[in-house]
């Protein structure tokens, strides 16, 4: 990886989360400023949605978990398109973290947007066929999923 750490340290985030390494670049989101940053200094984009986590990079497109679903973003054109919405349809909750599993399904954790220290959140499994299963509804801030 050709990475300029001094350049990366200049990229300031208010609430940086969701780090992802694709083998050549590091990507992360800033939830508060609705941005994606990258160690590739040419890809720093402001989004139309609130990002939470970079789930994967498939066919040169980033899969980004966000408040309204999963988005696909082209680092080359900065085109943003939603690929799956209404996983958990609630204006009070947002996707906080997740991962793409080897079988093409997702584990996704949702938390309350405003009172996450008092209200519980949940973990969902979303199959390749987009079947949604609630696995657990007993964690306040579901975080760090690793297969």
What is each stretch, according to the model?
Residues 120-137:
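A short, charged helix-loop
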Residues 39-42, 74-78, 126-130:
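Short loop/turn segments that connect beta-strands within beta-propeller blades
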């Amino acid at each position: 990886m050709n990475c300029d750490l001094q350049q990366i340290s200049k990229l300031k985030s208010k609430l940086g989360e969701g780090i992802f390494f694709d083998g050549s670049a590091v990507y992360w989101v800033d939830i508060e400023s609705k941005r994606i940053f990258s160690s590739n200094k040419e890809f720093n984009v402001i989004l139309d949605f609130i990002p939470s986590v970079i789930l994967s990079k498939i066919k040169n497109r980033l899969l980004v978990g966000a408040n309204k679903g999963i988005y696909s973003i082209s680092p080359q054109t900065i085109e943003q398109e939603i690929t799956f919405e209404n996983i958990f349809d609630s204006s009070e909750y947002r996707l906080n973290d997740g991962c793409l599993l080897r079988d093409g399904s997702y584990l996704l954790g949702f938390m309350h947007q405003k009172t996450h220290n008092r209200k519980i959140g949940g973990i969902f499994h979303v199959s390749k066929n987009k079947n949604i299963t609630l696995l657990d509804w007993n964690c306040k801030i579901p975080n760090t999923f690793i297969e």
